[in-house]
């Protein structure tokens, strides 16, 4: 059951209640929500740079966490999250929603069938078009201080897809770039 919604913008949380057909109490203060609503787990869907603080607070309250990717934007934040997981014996799971688009699920199924043979290497390119790419650069994502960078915010989807499709972790990675 949904026991609470927490957002710095209460109107947005009320709108979410309306969209979901729920009547969960709305909070603007995370500490208060954790203390009063006492959730079993929280879903973190905030600006990327805020994830670590929210995750650690929830873990320190004994609450498991499901977070949007990326989990954190800095290495020291990752250390803090891992330490909070260990200290509190709680878990953090990361959501990668690109896995669930029909085309990506189809690729996953095709790769598991014997029809394609064994994959021995991957060359993955992603091109931002004017529709999605332009929109990305108008929102908060464009600010490295809030998203960690285009690489961290966007490319994590693609690294996850390749790992998921192949059921493997990379052995070797190369990158090429140009500012021209």
Write out the residue ranges for each language-model feature.
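Beta-strand-loop-alpha-helix segment that lines the small-molecule cofactor/substrate pocket
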Residues: 36, 41, 47-48, 52-99, ...
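Short, Asp-centered acidic motifs that coordinate Mg2+ and/or phosphate
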Residues: 4, 41, 121
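Short loop/turn motifs at secondary-structure junctions
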Residues: 1, 22, 38, 115-118, ...
């Amino acid at each position: 059951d949904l026991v609470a919604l927490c957002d710095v913008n209460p109107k947005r949380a009320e709108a979410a209640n309306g969209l979901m057909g729920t009547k969960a109490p709305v909070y603007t203060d995370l500490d208060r929500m954790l203390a009063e609503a006492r959730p079993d787990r929280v879903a973190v869907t905030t600006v990327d740079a805020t994830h670590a603080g929210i995750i650690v607070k929830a873990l320190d309250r004994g609450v498991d966490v499901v977070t949007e990717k990326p989990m954190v934007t800095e290495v020291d934040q990752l250390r803090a999250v891992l330490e909070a997981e260990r200290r509190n014996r709680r878990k953090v799971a990361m959501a990668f929603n690109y896995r669930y688009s029909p085309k990506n699920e189809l690729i996953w199924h095709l790769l598991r069938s014997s029809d394609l043979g064994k994959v021995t290497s991957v060359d993955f390119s992603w091109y931002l078009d004017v529709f999605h790419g332009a929109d990305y650069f108008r929102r908060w994502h464009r600010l490295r201080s809030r998203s960690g960078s285009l690489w961290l915010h966007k490319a994590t989807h693609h690294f996850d897809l390749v790992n998921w499709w192949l059921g493997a972790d990379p052995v070797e990675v190369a990158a090429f770039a140009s500012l021209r």
